[in-house]
Amino acid sequence: MKQKRSKPAGLKKKAPYREEQQFVSSWISSGLLIPLLVILAGIVWYGFFAIHTNDVSGSDDREYASIARNIVNGKGIARNFVYPIDINFFAKFPVPEFMHPPGYPLIIAGFFKLFGVSDRAAVLPSYLSYFILVILFFYFTKTYLKLGTAVLATVILIFSRVILDVSIVALSEAVYTLFFFLFFMVFIKANSLGDIFLAGILLGASHLIRENIYPFFIPLFAFLYFYLDLPRSKKMIFFALGILVPILPNILRSYIDTGSPSFSYGKFVLMAFTEKYPGLSIYRDIQNPSLVDFLREVPGQIFIKYLNNLVNTFKEILSNFNPCLLVFFIVEMFYWKVNPAYKRIKILFLSLFVSQILFICLFTSTHRFFIPFLPMMILFASEGVWRLSNILAAQVKVHWRRGILLLGRFAFLMFLIVPTAHLIVTSKGPPQLGFKIPQTFYLIPREEAKKLIHFLDDELKKDKVVWTDLPEILEWEGNRFCGWLPIRIETIYEIDKKIPVDAILITNFGTAVRPLGEGWKELLRSEQSLPQFRNVKLYKSWPIFAKLLVRDEKNKE
């Protein structure tokens, strides 16, 4: 009887991804990956941290830190800084904080309680968020994708310039990104009413860190309606109740402080950056405009603003996110022959991402609102590279496959990590900042801010209210009550009827970064004073030149 000849083992076809999985497991066990990735994250993060300034140095940073200090000092969730528009709602310091949600200042206040009030304590939540995000991201990715893809994606996340930028500042982006990703994890894995309730709590908590829940209502409730094998009405109710748990205390606070359970600056944000109210001018006037009148009189301005923001949003994303990452992310979004669990992740992400673009463009166009989506974009791009390299490797001879796989993935990795690695190794900042690079959204050096505060303390008592074009400096470094200068000089006298104007501080820095009315610029350049503010003091230092006008004693009541 003729025996059947068996094929030599070497001629057996192996799927490229199987070869790669064997390669990954041959040199390291998955149990060691987490500590190794955390060590890599620590090295990269510290290198990035070491070449940058390490203070609370931006505008919003200082506001968050100042509010947190007020919380620790028992003054409540309040700020020492007022806008001219605030005189329509509040008449004394400190002013209840509704410009920013209270969640992030409360987190910073917790760190102030533990470590004392300092710049470093204010930035600690962002530091920690980076490392926690790396760990959660790896676990989530390896749950739904191959181990090799999870490692590739996590390394890219570790080297992400955008994520690193927000991890060393006291802005809310890093903490919000962590909460949003945690919510996404819980929501996509939910298979019980308890899981849905927990997802609602996490979404509500993220809303207290950044008020960004509104774009997500329609896609999330639509997802609940069509997915998850649970009673529809119960899913909706449990999710809504979960959202309300963290939000209800803030609604109660709003009612106590303002008499309205839903007090908001939302209408001003909507009308700002239009032809009628260019830039932030709407906040720097004492008139309280009607949104209904605005929409009736100039409805086209909102439409033009929306279109401009839509175009600028894509420009912001393209200029701030790695182009190579975006290409593979978009390619992966067109591939839908995937398993049901991964398809659900894609559907949920895309619905949230598109809804965010369409909604946020009503108000602004900054890329900061899309940073929370970046981890998932990295996940999809990494899976796209993994799949395309498998397809490419399948077209070549067997003995070339491993080389093609490794070359493709290594090239993708290099495109994404080399820019950050090069920055860490070679970059130096200006000598005035100790050869360190300014943090993202940097305002002025901390030492210069302190010098300006010393000048003010020498000239004014601590309880005097100063109206200035650099209120964040006075609020955080100076810990004194202050206001933002209105557009017109004469408005100062109207403001004084409700909130004291003890002094006026005009700076060359503030007038350059935030254009004031021509009257203020002329006042800074000339030797003139103002009626009732004839006592003039000058401050000169790099990079600030300032003019202080102190109210005449005889004109004070």
Where are these regions (language model features)?
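Short acidic/glycine- and proline-prone juxtamembrane loop motifs at membrane-interface regions
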Residues: 162-175
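Membrane-embedded, lumen/periplasm-facing catalytic core of multi-pass transferases
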Residues: 406-470
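Membrane-interface transmembrane helices that cradle and orient dolichyl/undecaprenyl
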Residues: 142-145, 183-198, 206, 225-226
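Membrane-lumen/periplasm interface segments of specific transmembrane helices
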Residues: 45, 234-314, 318-328, 415-426
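Signature aromatic-anchored transmembrane alpha helix within multi-pass, membrane-resident enzymes
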Residues: 33-39, 155, 201, 217-218, ...
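Transmembrane-helix motifs of polytopic, lipid-linked glycan transferases
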Residues: 121-145, 178, 182, 331-334
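Hydrophobic, aromatic-rich transmembrane alpha-helices
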Residues: 134, 225, 305-343, 350, ...
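Start-transfer (signal-anchor) and selected internal transmembrane alpha helices
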Residues: 1-48, 142, 232-242, 406-411, ...
